[in-house]
A protein has these predicted regions:
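Mixed-charge, glycine-accented linear interaction segment located at domain edges/termini
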Residues: 94-147
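Solvent-exposed edge beta-strands and adjacent loop segments
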Residues: 1-46, 99-117
Length: 147
């Protein structure tokens, strides 16, 4: 479509990190507002990382102190197709603000719980303002430069 990106080009030292989540523990929202003829999208990405470990906390510190985060997220259409149909969207970059639309670490709430069956993990929120709704990423996952 005309509202997608088909490739990702990165500076050699800047790569994507892969985070995977349990079903129902991650998602994004994009809320548009218009004022004085300008439209802004408030984009929020929320996800839950289970288990608190030293390695997880090291990764979380890198995320919490990063400046300029762009995320490519994958969502499922959940239409019972086999294999499942997925869509990927780019958050933190658009054709209006470009790299200045980057996402920032907004909050991270970590807890171990009090019982044996209580969840143990961290809820993370990243946010940004964009000048347009998130664009679909139509390239392949294999073409995304990752660590």
């Amino acid at each position: 479509s005309a509202h997608d990106y088909s490739a990702v080009t990165m500076v050699a030292t800047k790569l994507f990190y892969v985070w995977e989540f349990d079903r129902g523990s991650a998602g994004f929202t994009s809320s548009a507002t218009r004022e004085n003829g300008s439209t802004l999208m408030e984009v929020s990405l929320e996800f839950y990382i289970p288990k608190i470990t030293g390695v997880v906390n090291e990764d979380l510190m890198m995320l919490a102190t990063s400046c300029g985060i762009t995320a490519i997220i994958e969502t499922y259409a959940d239409d019972c197709a086999a294999p499942a149909v997925t869509y990927m969207f780019v958050l933190g970059w658009d054709e209006i603000f470009e790299e200045t639309a980057y996402m920032e670490f907004t909050s991270g709430e970590q807890g171990t719980g009090t019982g044996l069956q209580t969840a143990n993990g961290t809820a993370i929120t990243l946010t940004c303002q964009q000048g347009e709704y998130p664009r679909e990423y139509s390239g392949t996952q294999a073409s995304i430069p990752i660590v």
